């Protein structure tokens, strides 16, 4: 069946992918012919996710490496999977429930809600998998993993228990990012900074005990104070006046002469009456604001640091919903007598409380002033609500105890991070690491394997010494009720059975009948109190210890998604079981990831794998940059510049999208993506398709069979292209081995479009009518086969379709052996001759174009001087040169005729007479005018780029665009100058 005129990507892509899957082409070990393994882990996209350009870029690079290694015979595994994405998934499902008019999460209860989440996951959670298939991702989908799969859950819980028992996980009170909408702690990655128009309120805090001081109010030209006033207050500034209710100190810089003498004194907090100290800390900058800073350790990360250094209390004055928590808050009321106005703020939303505090400050005279202020406010990236730094009880990993192996592994080269600058980011984060908050107040996720029990033996309670509680003692225990208020005890275990044994050990040391109690699981502390009290009361009536129960309840929180995804490499390979896959593929070879999650994910995987199995998770980390729009701007919905990879695939085909991303994947440099580039690379695929159709029309595919070695060739053109094929194979392999994806793509582009389609196809046309026809058919078939093979990792669909429709194939292209030939195929004589021919044709074409010779006009050429090698090359290829350079013929002369353009090539020179062909004077004037305008434009660009204010204040993408335009202008100026110089030779 003859080839179609064009490649129909829309029809072929689904058909080809289905064929690959049915053939098991992507399964681990498929096509393996050597002992080496290659394993790469997909960064698991969120189960809620849809394919965006970052995914498309990242997975294209992974697929290239996977297909390349698979074709080279490596035992290859590209491990796919999805992340359960705790907060994102819970948000989606809650929104769906609300849209359908169903009860909310809290009304449903945990178990029923989680059933709904699993239903949603089964119905809608596979969207991104199908989208990755459209991109051509050759993952082993039979091993598709999910971070909530039972085996993965076992791994996560085991690691938590192990790290807890080693003392690396603990429960503590620290400041976290708190999302009031979802009522949970969130990671830094889930926080986005939003610039807002706001106010800076200046507040006056009165010095305690009637103290006063002299405050400078006028200064000379050198900044020295010239006048003072007596003050009995300090002025502080804040964008969040409602937090003043939790202030516990005022910080001043010890070098600030205005306030240094006040250090150690106190101010009285308005509304609250709390006396708070003035402390010395370098965080207070004398040059900013008033120089005195209100410190609220429980509601500001910087203030928390000051509080830790200076010993200030931390008082939380908000609930998880960001409403004011005052009246029943013992921390707030301790040591002070809040005013009625302060207590009236209890229960108000933080923003309403802000208005009331400002109004009260104005009424009572402690509002010093208001300044308009544009500043950044952190928001939850999903809730779009301003987050609150919140002091809460959370679970933490004591990262300081486990980071050193992760640092050492990169420093010693066990794991390499590329580009090198990203290794610095990695080190910076690890060397300045804080304890990692791993608990989230959500329901969807890995529930923390910790159970709590009541402290049923209060410290102040004693029995009569007979190790048995009688009726009176049990009644006293109930009446005392101390276990209602004491902090609960807790144990950590893999499951309830394991934790029951630990609680039973605790109970064994208690008097009878408590030591006979059965451990049962209940939902909450409140239920535990009720069940225990009822059990003790019942025992007093029936004295039957078999009915005595000790209720425990599981921590309701779940683990941070990054905790489970931090175990992705070993968890997907079957750990903690000793699976064959774990033994064979771990540690993995390379991780390809974006720079934005180096510290959130990459560093944590390094930390976790080394802490758990004492091995690095991967040998190389390749960090790619961002995909931006064609002007260098970050893609965002608000700017309307988002490119949807699926829409691009629909319009241009997956191969064009993949090749574009690959060709632009310069290490460490952001991509500037445009549809024009994608269209251009679609044309590249069309060029290869047309070359194969040309081959078909000339009988190349008749009886053609796949051959690893090139055919024996005698024709110079055939010997030359065989050598070029050997060269490009070496270039591609060297580039991919060094993760220079752009170099591989650009080498293939230059070879396929330039050497094969532009030159070899043209050179071969006359040979099909000579005795070299059979050899040329064999050579062209072999060369085009190699084009398909070498391009397949980047453009899998069109190459697989071409492979199936050309010649006789024993197996699919996806499993065809990668070539091993190289520069040994180069024939020096053929290479020298054809390079000379191409150089002459290109020089003539360039000269014609520069001086605007009409494209279809054939010109005579005068041979001025030529060595013996050149004469032989010209004699053998004269017809080709005349046809491809659009020449009438060659003559010889000792000197160039008047009005001729000279051309130099290796071993000689030629002249092209132009008198009467073009108006040389008019052409020079046109070029000069164009050059003058270009110089003017470039001068403007240089002026902007030489202006420090422009470079410092303009958006990065605007500066980059100016630099790009200047570079393009320099290139254009060089071309115009060269053309003018050529014309100046003539007249």
Swiss-Prot record:
Source organism per UniProt: Cereibacter sphaeroides (strain KD131 / KCTC 12085) (Rhodobacter sphaeroides)
Binding-site residues for ATP, renumbered to this chain: 637
Recorded coiled-coil stretches: 917-987
InterPro entries xrefs: aa-tRNA-synth_I_CS, aa-tRNA-synth_Ia, Anticodon_Ia_Val, M/V/L/I-tRNA-synth_anticd-bd, Rossmann-like_a/b/a_fold, tRNA-bd_arm, tRNAsynth_Ia_anticodon-bd, Val-tRNA_synth_C_sf
Motif ('HIGH' region) on chain: 45-55
Quaternary structure, from the entry: Monomer.
EC id: 6.1.1.9
Listed name of the protein: Valine--tRNA ligase
Purpose of the protein: Catalyzes the attachment of valine to tRNA(Val). As ValRS can inadvertently accommodate and process structurally similar amino acids such as threonine, to avoid such errors, it has a 'posttransfer' editing activity that hydrolyzes mischarged Thr-tRNA(Val) in a tRNA-dependent manner.
GO biological process, one term: valyl-tRNA aminoacylation
NCBIfam families, A to Z: PRK05729.1 (NF004349)
Pfam family membership, one: Val_tRNA-synt_C
């Amino acid at each position: 069946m003859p080839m179609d005129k064009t490649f129909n990507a829309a029809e072929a892509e689904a058909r080809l992918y289905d064929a690959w899957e049915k053939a098991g082409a992507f399964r681990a070990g498929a096509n393996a012919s050597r002992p080496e393994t290659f394993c790469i882990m997909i960064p698991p996209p969120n189960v809620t996710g849809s394919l965006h350009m970052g995914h498309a870029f990242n997975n294209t690079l992974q697929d290239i490496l996977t297909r390349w290694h698979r074709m080279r015979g490596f035992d290859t595994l590209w491990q796919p999977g999805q992340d359960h994405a705790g907060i994102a998934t819970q948000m989606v499902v809650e929104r769906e429930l609300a849209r359908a008019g169903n009860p909310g999460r809290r009304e449903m209860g945990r178990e029923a809600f989680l059933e709904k989440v699993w239903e949603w996951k089964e119905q809608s959670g596979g969207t991104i998998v199908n989208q990755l298939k459209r991109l051509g991702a050759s993952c082993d989908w039979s091993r598709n993993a999910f971070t909530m799969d039972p085996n993965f859950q076992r791994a996560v819980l085991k690691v938590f228990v192990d790290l807890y028992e080693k003392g690396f996980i603990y429960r503590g009170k620290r400041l976290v990012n708190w999302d009031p909408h979802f009522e949970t702690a969130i990671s830094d990655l889930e926080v986005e900074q939003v610039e807002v128009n706001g106010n800076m309120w200046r507040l006056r805090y009165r010095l305690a005990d009637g103290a006063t001081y002299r405050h400078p109010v006028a200064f000379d030209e050198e900044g020295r104070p010239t006048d003072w006033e007596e003050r009995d207050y300090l002025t502080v500034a804040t964008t969040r006046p409602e937090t003043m209710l939790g202030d516990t100190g005022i910080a001043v810089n010890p070098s600030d002469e205005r306030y240094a003498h006040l250090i150690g004194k106190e101010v009285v907090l308005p509304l609250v009456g709390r006396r708070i100290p003035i402390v010395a800390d370098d965080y207070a900058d004398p040059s900013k604001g008033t120089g005195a800073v209100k410190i609220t350790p429980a509601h500001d990360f910087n203030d928390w640091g000051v509080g830790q250094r200076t010993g200030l209390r931390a008082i939380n004055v908000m609930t998880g919903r960001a409403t004011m928590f005052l009246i029943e808050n013992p921390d707030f009321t301790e040591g002070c007598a809040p005013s009625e106005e302060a207590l009236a703020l209890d229960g108000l939303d933080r923003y309403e409380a802000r208005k009331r505090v400002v109004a009260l400050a104005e009424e009572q005279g402690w509002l010093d002033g208001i300044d308009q202020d544009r500043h950044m406010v952190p928001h939850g990236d999903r809730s779009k609500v301003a987050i609150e730094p919140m002091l809460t009880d959370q679970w933490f990993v004591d990262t300081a105890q486990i980071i050193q192996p992760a640092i050492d592994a990169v420093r010693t080269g066990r794991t390499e991070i590329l580009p090198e600058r990203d290794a610095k980011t990695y080190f910076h984060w690890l060397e300045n690491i804080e304890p990692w908050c791993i608990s989230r107040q959500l329901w969807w996720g890995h529930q923390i394997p910790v159970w709590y029990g009541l402290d049923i033996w209060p410290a102040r309670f004693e029995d009569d010494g007979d190790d048995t509680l009688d009726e009176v003692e049990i009644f006293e225990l109930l009446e005392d009720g101390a276990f209602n208020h004491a902090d609960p005890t807790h144990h950590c275990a893999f499951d309830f059975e394991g934790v029951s044994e630990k609680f039973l050990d605790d109970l064994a040391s208690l008097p009878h009948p408590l030591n006979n109690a059965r451990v049962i699981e209940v939902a909450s502390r409140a239920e535990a109190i009720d069940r225990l009290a009822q059990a003790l009361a019942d025992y007093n009536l029936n004295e039957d210890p078999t009915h005595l129960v000790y209720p425990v309840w599981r921590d309701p929180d779940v683990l941070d998604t990054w905790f489970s995804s931090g175990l992705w490499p070993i968890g997907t390979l079957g750990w903690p079981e000793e699976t064959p896959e774990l033994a064979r593929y771990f540690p993995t070879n390379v991780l390809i990831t974006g720079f934005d999650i180096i510290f959130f994910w990459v560093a944590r995987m390094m930390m976790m794998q080394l802490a758990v199995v004492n091995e690095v998770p991967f040998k190389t980390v390749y960090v790619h940059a961002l995909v931006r729009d064609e002007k260098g701007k970050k893609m965002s919905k608000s700017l309307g510049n988002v490119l949807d990879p699926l829409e691009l695939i629909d319009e241009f085909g997956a191969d064009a999208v993949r090749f574009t991303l690959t060709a632009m994947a310069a290490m460490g440099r952001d991509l500037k993506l445009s549809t024009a580039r994608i269209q251009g690379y679609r044309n590249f695929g069309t060029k290869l398709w047309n070359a194969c159709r040309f081959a078909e029309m000339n009988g190349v595919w008749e009886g053609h069979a796949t051959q690893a070695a090139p055919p024996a060739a005698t024709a110079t053109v055939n010997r030359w292209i065989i050598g070029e094929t050997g060269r490009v194979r070496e270039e591609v392999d060297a580039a991919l081995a060094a993760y220079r994806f752009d170099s591989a793509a650009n080498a293939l582009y230059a070879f396929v479009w330039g050497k094969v389609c532009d030159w070899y196809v043209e050179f071969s046309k006359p040979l099909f009518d000579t005795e070299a026809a059979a050899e040329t058919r064999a050579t062209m078939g072999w060369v085009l086969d190699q084009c398909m093979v070498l391009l397949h990792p980047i453009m899998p669909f069109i190459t697989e379709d071409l492979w199936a429709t050309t010649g006789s194939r024993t197996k699919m292209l996806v499993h065809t052996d990668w070539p091993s030939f190289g520069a040994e195929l180069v024939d020096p004589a053929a290479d020298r001759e054809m390079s000379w021919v191409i150089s002459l044709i290109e020089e003539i074409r360039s000269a014609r174009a520069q001086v605007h010779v009409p494209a279809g006009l054939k010109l005579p050429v005068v041979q001025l001087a030529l060595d013996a090698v050149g004469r032989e090359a010209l004699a053998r290829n004269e017809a080709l040169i005349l046809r491809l350079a659009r020449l009438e013929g060659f003559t010889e002369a000792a000197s160039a005729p008047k009005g001729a353009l000279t051309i130099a090539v290796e071993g000689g020179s030629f002249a092209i007479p132009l008198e009467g062909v073009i108006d040389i004077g008019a052409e020079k004037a046109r070029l000069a005018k164009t050059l003058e305008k270009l110089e003017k434009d470039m001068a403007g660009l240089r002026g902007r780029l030489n202006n420090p204010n422009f470079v410092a204040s303009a958006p990065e993408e605007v500066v980059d665009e100016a630099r790009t335009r200047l570079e393009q202008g320099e290139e254009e100026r060089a071309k115009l100058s060269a053309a003018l110089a050529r014309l100046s030779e003539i007249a």
